[in-house]
Amino acid sequence: MEKYITLITNTITPLRKSPQRLNLRPTSQEDREAIARLLFSAYDESTFPTQENAQHYVETILNGTHGEFYPEASPILIDDNGRAVAVLLSLKNRLDHNGPENTPTLLELITTPSRRREGIAEELITYALDVMHTQHHGAASTHISETNAAALALYLTLGWQRWTPQDDTFLPA
């Protein structure tokens, strides 16, 4: 069974290197199919064997199966051809994890393989944290597979910290 690491951060984003350069917008229900196509293209067959599997997973997120979907803090980047390039799907409260109570969760961060390493993921995270901060959430969490070195490096570079249940009273200042 795959193991996950829980990371937390405060929602103040002092590490922003430059102004937002991408035309991001909140995810809407109309983005379901575009997100499913992106998800299917970004993962290997063991995660989503078919487009329908990816579509079902997206439906569970947007319909609140994992917790209340947080569309304002779920930015999406659509290219000039109307295709989803990247998306970050957030929840106001995640129902199926052991993270900090009442803390929004960055659930899925997906960038199309051909557009990775362009700083898009960092902008999506910063956008989501800015929204959360504006809406009076002091902290956010995410869960990263122990084997996903690239994602772990990204979050740690952005100042996220490892969290365990023993740290329950600690959230970054």
Protein language model regions, located:
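Acyl-donor-binding surface of acyltransferase catalytic domains
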Residues: 1-22, 169
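A short beta-loop-alpha structural element at the N-terminal edge
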Residues: 23-37, 48
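Conserved GNAT-fold acetyl-CoA-binding loop/helix
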Residues: 43-62
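A short helix-loop-beta-strand connector motif used in the catalytic cores of GNAT acetyltransferases and
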Residues: 63-76, 86, 105
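Conserved acetyl-CoA binding element of GNAT-fold acetyltransferases
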Residues: 91, 99-113
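Conserved acetyl-CoA-binding loop-helix of GNAT-fold acetyltransferases
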Residues: 108-111, 117-130, 134, 152-157
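Conserved beta-strand-loop-alpha-helix junction that forms the acyl-donor binding cleft
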Residues: 113, 141-152, 168-173
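Conserved GNAT acetyl-CoA-binding A-motif
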Residues: 132-143
